[in-house]
């Protein structure tokens, strides 16, 4: 099935990618283990100058430059957060519609991804009972945008507290 409204390619796991290309995964991993990293393209967490500038936005001392991580756009930031928190055996619940990476990044990494769909017949309001049923002891994260993108529905204090209580 092809989704013409999708803005991203289908996510692949590493083993699927290597099956697709015919490359040897073990040989690749061995090459990576022995590769010289003497060249340098910059700090992976962002340039010290940019990190200092971001930290400087906040009251002095509240945020240190070494606590700031610069990512390559919002997708990179979402990937960092999702993959830092989620592990095999976990699941996450995504309130849709949402950004595609919110459900494709964990799904592509083998994380069970459950969906709670906002519905027109409910005026796109979050069904808290459905959210509660979607969560279990292995739910590590509830992913939502607020206000929702693309619909624009906003969860205010009471609704956000309900989400926290369910989590």
Cite the ranges covered by each PLM segment.
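Short, solvent-exposed loop/turn segments at secondary-structure junctions
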Residues: 7-11, 75, 99, 148-150
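A short helix-loop-beta submotif of the ANL/AMP-binding
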Residues: 108-114
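Conserved PLP-anchoring active-site segment centered on the Schiff-base-forming lysine
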Residues: 66, 84-106
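Generic structural signal for small/hydrophobic residues in well-ordered secondary structure
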Residues: 4-7, 54, 68, 92, ...
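Glycine/Thr-rich phosphate-binding loops of Rossmann-like dinucleotide-binding domains
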Residues: 12-14, 78-79, 102-103, 151-152
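Short, acidic/turn-prone active-site loops that include or flank metal/cofactor-
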Residues: 98-99, 117-123
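N-terminal small-domain helix-loop-helix segment of the aminotransferase-like
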Residues: 1-73
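Active-site phosphate-binding strand-loop segment of PLP-dependent enzymes
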Residues: 120-167
